[in-house]
Amino acid sequence: MNLVRLLETRVTQFEMRSQPRLRMAAPDSGFSLVLAEAKQIPPSFYAYLYDRVGRDHHWTSRLLPEKRLAAEIHRAGIAVHVLYADGAPAGWFELDWARKQGETRLVHFGILPEFRGRGLARYLLSEALAAGFAIGNKVMTLETNTLDHPRALQLYEEAGFIAVSMRVVSTRAIDG
C-alpha cells in the first residue's frame, strides 16, 4: 500500500494594485538573455520547466496527464513566457487573466536551480509584472507558500506586492 505523505504549509495571497514605475534591466549575469512568449508551449516542455523549478518545493497542481495539462495551459487567457540564458531555459512564468475580471494572476514563476543566485529572479519578475499589467488589468495577484524558495516571499514584497490573506493547507509531498 502506498501512503501519501502530506506537508502542512502556510499559503500567502498577495496583490499589487499599481504597476511598478521602473522596469528592471537585465542583470549582468554573464549570459545572453532572451525572454520569449511560448505560444502553444508543448506540454512536455511545460512539464519539464514545472518539474525543474517546482520539484524541490512540492509543486503538484500541474502534475497532470498530458491532455489535461494541454487543456489548462492552452486555454484562452493564459500566457507562458520562458527566459533563456545562452539558449538554455533558465526560468519561466505563467499568467492567467481569464480567471477573474480585472485581475491578472501570476500562476507560476521560477528560476531553474542551476541559474539561481545570479539576479535573474528580480529581472524575470519585473518582466512578468510588465506583461501582466500590459494586458490592461488593474490588479496583479499571486500566491506563495512556506515550501517555496526561501527568498520568494522577500522578492515579492520588495517588488511591491502586499499580503492580503493567509491560510494553512496540506499538500502532497514529492519524494524522490
What are these regions (language model features)?
Residues A26-T60:
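Short amphipathic alpha-helix that is part of the acyltransferase structural core
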Residues L112-S126, I135, L147-R151:
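Conserved glycine-rich acetyl-CoA-binding loop
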Residues A79, K138, I162:
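Short acidic/polar active-site loop segments enriched in Thr and Asp
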Residues G132-T144:
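Conserved GNAT acetyl-CoA-binding A-motif
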Residues R116, L142-A152, V164, V169-D175:
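Conserved beta-strand-loop-alpha-helix junction that forms the acyl-donor binding cleft
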Residues L64-K67, R75-E103, H108-I111:
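A conserved beta-strand-loop-helix scaffold within acyl/acetyltransferase catalytic domains
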Residues M1-L35:
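Acyl-donor-binding surface of acyltransferase catalytic domains
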Residues F133, L155-M166:
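Conserved acetyl-CoA-binding loop of GNAT-fold acetyltransferases
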